[in-house]
Each structure stands twice: as structure tokens, then as C-alpha cells.
């Protein structure tokens, strides 16, 4: 079986606080992996590590078979799209402008890709409306669109339905299923809401106080 993400004894400490304690998980290619735990259990810390935003204290992880302690890990990380903690969007920009900005950051020609991405996440009719006037669900979908701008194989979502109303939750759920089933994207979802993950996940990891 091919694994998109593997962690082996992964550990993260802050002074005297151990947030991740010898964590070992395996995320198969093509899976929707639900990473379940209460707030403060270490879910976001793991995501920040695999996205390269922080360094582990001990252990290792691999993305598409490339270990984090090799120079090739940067190439593997380019296959990840992520929404960490909150959507990385510019509130004074429209949805289209946000996606264009991400294309510029990535150095990708943007003209042909903006509208397909907007249609994919259901924001094609937002026009000149700025993101600051979007609902929370719309902002979350825009954040996912921005994460998809680099055409990733692996999508990492940190609490994607947190704070959303029932309709917003359904829209995110349907989008995740579409990305996985129609586009073949492996999805890693952290959440403290097991009931919602049960509607999505093909595989699970349960974390408590840094332990699986």
C-alpha cells in the first residue's frame, strides 16, 4: 500500500510541555483520513509540522516516501494544499482576486484557472463581493480554493467545519467528497466532531494528549 503521509515516533515539545508524543500514523493514498481529538490534543501541531511551519523535536515523518530530514522534502511539500487553523485569504479582495494572488505567489499563470476553481467550490457568482462580506462557510470554501491553486495531490484541512451552520457543513462535506472521488485527492481532516467525520472518513486516527 502506498502512503501519502507516514509519521514515525514523531514528537514535539515546547519547554516542559509535550504536545506530540512518539506519534505514528499512516495515511493511505486516496483516503479521506479523519484525525480526531479534542481541542488542544495536538491536531494542529501535527499539521504545522508536516506543512513545514514548525520542526519536530524528535522522530520523523515522510510525505510520499520522502523523509523530512532530506533536502527532497521541499519537493514533496509542494504536493500539499493546506488550510491551517483559518483560511489564508485576503478579506479586502474578491474570491477571484484571492485566487489570482495565490497564483502569483506560486508563479503560476492565472488567467485560465480562476473560474474553474471558483466553480469547483461554488463561488463563481460572487462577483465583486469582497471576502470580508462572505459567510464563514464561503470563506472556508475560498480557503480551500486557494489551497487547490497549486494543483495538490494531498489536501490538509484543519477543523474545516468549525463554527459553520448546518448548510455550510453540508457544502464543505460535499466539496471534500467531490475532491476525493472525482479528482483523486487524498484528504487529511482534523476535527473534534466525530459525528461529522463519520460521514466522510475512510480511515481514522484518534489523538489524546499527543498519543494515538
Where does each model-flagged region fall?
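Helix-to-loop junction immediately C-terminal to a conserved catalytic motif
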Residues: 51
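Catalytic Walker B motif of ABC-type/P-loop ATPase nucleotide-binding domains
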Residues: 155-159
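Conserved ABC transporter NBD signature motif
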Residues: 59-69, 75-76
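Helical segment within the ABC ATPase nucleotide-binding domain
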Residues: 170-183
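Walker A (P-loop) phosphate-binding loop of ABC-type ATPase nucleotide-binding domains
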Residues: 38-42
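Conserved ABC ATPase "signature" region
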Residues: 100, 104, 109-126
Amino acid at each position: 500500500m502506498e502512503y501519502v503521509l507516514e509519521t514515525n515516533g514523531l514528537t514535539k515539545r515546547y519547554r516542559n510541555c509535550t504536545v506530540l508524543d512518539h506519534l505514528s500514523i499512516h495515511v493511505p493514498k486516496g483516503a479521506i483520513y479523519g484525525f480526531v481529538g479534542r481541542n488542544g490534543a495536538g491536531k494542529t501541531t501535527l499539521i504545522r509540522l508536516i506543512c513545514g511551519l514548525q520542526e519536530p523535536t524528535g522522530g520523523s515523518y515522510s510525505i510520499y516516501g520522502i523523509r523530512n530530514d532530506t533536502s527532497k522534502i521541499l519537493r514533496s511539500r509542494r504536493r500539499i494544499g493546506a488550510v491551517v487553523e483559518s483560511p489564508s485569504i485576503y478579506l479586502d479582495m474578491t474570491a477571484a482576486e484571492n485566487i489570482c494572488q495565490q497564483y502569483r505567489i506560486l508563479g503560476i499563470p492565472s488567467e485560465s484557472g480562476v473560474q474553474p476553481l471558483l466553480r469547483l467550490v461554488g463561488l463563481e457568482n460572487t462577483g465583486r463581493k469582497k471576502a470580508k462580506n462572505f459567510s464563514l462557510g464561503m470563506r472556508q470554501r475560498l480557503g480551500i480554493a486557494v489551497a487547490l491553486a497549486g494543483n495538490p495531490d494531498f489536501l490538509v484541512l484543519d477543523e474545516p467545519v468549525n463554527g459553520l451552520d448546518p448548510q455550510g457543513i453540508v457544502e464543505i462535506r460535499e466539496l471534500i467528497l467531490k475532491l476525493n472521488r472525482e479528482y483523486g485527492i487524498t484528504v487529511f481532516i482534523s476535527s473534534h466532531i466525530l459525528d461529522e467525520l463519520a460521514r466522510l472518513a475512510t480511515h481514522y486516527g484518534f489523538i489524546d494528549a499527543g498519543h494515538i
